[in-house]
């Protein structure tokens, strides 16, 4: 393999966007086009216990991956990812060269010991093993050096720097790389997996590839940057950079065909890429799924997301806890407004009148004249519009069900 290698993780990391449901024909064609583009390492998806759906890049066995790969290019590597605890060693067959060649094993800091046991078992089965500690930036130098000592004893194919939270600046990357490069066995590749929360994935990848080191480097990327949250380094950008600066190697037309036929249509249906909320999550040192959770509520302004994320307990920030963020969201919403005072105000405003509720819609527009007549004939009506302010009906108050809409309407009223 060349000194610098690109690993495309579209079918695995990109799978978080569409629940891994690319479709069987699309899965096979993407792998074949990546092969034709000469992408060095193709990640086919997750190995996960019990998974069985030919349309998804989730596989319960290496045999299932084999059926999706089809004819292999002998000059490339095909890999799958195992999240420690997601599948047992017994469910993974011996590597016979007909399916995946390698397994990327991802694990948290508290899972190091059992993950290394599984790593050894996979190496003994003939797989090229990529050891990938989640959130490398959260490791102290001492903890990272201890981990490297164990890596040198294990002798996997590759060891990864993983920017899980998308917080790495150039200086962070270089400091960690030099620490690893100086202490890691020379025969072990160093990989870099980034997330684009701060729009630095491409810049950091260029810095890494420009380093004067004989060590083999692996840079992860996904087509069109497809990946959960802010997404990843774009495969088409980094391959073009290598072609232009380090020597022609990749056929980018094949990658552009994948974008045109499959990925761009998905981008019309699903959202990924840079967003202020993911920037806030990165700066606050929070898992991007926290930002995704709050964005999906569609009730919060960026200022509210900033407040919630920055009030999370520090020990809870790095690992996503859906129950915890749900509780924090409810707590914030409950305390952001003094409900009792608001209730008293609305009771005083209504003051015993009949309440007429107006909701936006076709029937309201069709009956505007009748509604105005009704209001003019009954001075004992208190008129409340729900989630909008009508331009042709005078209302006494408006009820807004979420903060984001409230602030946008508030801006209109103030103007």
Labelled PLM ranges:
Residues 1-341:
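Catalytic cores and adjacent flexible loops of soluble metabolic enzymes
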Residues 1-4, 349-355, 379:
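A short, charged/proline- and glycine-enriched loop
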Residues 15-19, 364-368, 392:
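Short N-terminal binding/cap micro-motifs at the start of the first secondary-structure element
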Residues 48, 335-370, 389, 403:
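Aromatic- and Gly/Pro-rich donor/ligand-binding loops
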Residues 53-64, 371-375, 395-401:
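Glycine-rich loop at the start of a catalytic domain that most often binds anionic cofactors/ligands
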Residues 81-84, 108, 358-362, 400-403, ...:
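Structural motif
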Residues 90-95, 117-118, 204, 367-374, ...:
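A short acidic, amphipathic alpha-helical/loop segment
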Residues 374-382, 388-415:
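Acidic/Gly/His-enriched mid-domain segments of enzyme catalytic cores or analogous surface patches
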């Amino acid at each position: 393999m060349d000194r610098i290698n690109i690993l495309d993780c579209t079918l695995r990391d990109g799978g978080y966007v569409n629940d891994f449901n690319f479709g069987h024909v699309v899965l096979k064609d993407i792998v074949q086009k990546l092969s034709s583009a000469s992408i060095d390492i193709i990640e086919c998806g997750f190995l996960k216990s019990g998974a069985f759906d030919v349309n998804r890049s989730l596989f319960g066995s290496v045999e299932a991956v084999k059926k999706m790969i089809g004819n292999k290019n002998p000059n490339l590597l095909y890999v799958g990812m195992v999240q420690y605890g997601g599948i047992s060693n017994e469910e993974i067959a011996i590597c016979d060269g007909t399916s995946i060649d390698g397994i990327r094993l991802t694990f948290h800091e508290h899972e190091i010991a059992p993950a290394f046991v599984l790593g050894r078992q996979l190496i003994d089965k003939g797989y090229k093993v990529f050891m990938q500690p989640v959130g490398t930036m959260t490791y102290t130098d001492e903890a990272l050096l201890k981990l490297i000592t164990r890596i040198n004893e294990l002798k996997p194919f590759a060891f990864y720097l993983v920017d899980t939270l998308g917080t790495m600046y150039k200086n962070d990357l270089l400091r960690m790389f030099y620490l690893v490069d100086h202490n890691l066995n020379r025969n072990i590749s160093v990989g870099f997996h980034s997330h684009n929360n701060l729009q630095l994935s491409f810049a950091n990848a260029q810095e890494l590839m420009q380093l004067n080191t004989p060590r083999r480097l692996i840079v992860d990327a996904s087509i069109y940057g497809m990946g959960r949250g802010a997404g990843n380094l774009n495969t088409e950008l980094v391959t073009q950079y290598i072609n232009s600066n380090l020597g022609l190697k990749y056929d980018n037309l094949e990658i552009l065909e994948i974008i045109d036929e499959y990925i761009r249509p998905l981008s019309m249906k699903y959202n990924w890429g840079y967003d202020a909320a993911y920037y806030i999550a990165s700066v606050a040192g929070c898992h991007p799924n926290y930002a995704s959770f709050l964005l999906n509520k569609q009730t919060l302004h960026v200022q509210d997301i900033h407040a919630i994320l920055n009030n999370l307990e520090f020990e809870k920030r790095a690992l996503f806890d859906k129950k915890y963020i749900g509780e924090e969201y409810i707590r914030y919403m409950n305390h952001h407004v003094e409900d009792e005072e608001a209730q008293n105000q609305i009771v005083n405003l209504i003051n015993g009148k009949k309440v007429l509720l107006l909701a936006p819609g076709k029937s309201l527009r069709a009956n505007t004249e009748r509604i105005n007549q009704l209001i003019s004939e009954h001075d004992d009506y208190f008129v409340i519009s729900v989630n909008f302010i009508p331009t042709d009906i005078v209302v006494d108050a408006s009820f807004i069900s979420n903060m984001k809409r409230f602030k946008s309407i508030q801006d209109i009223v103030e103007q």
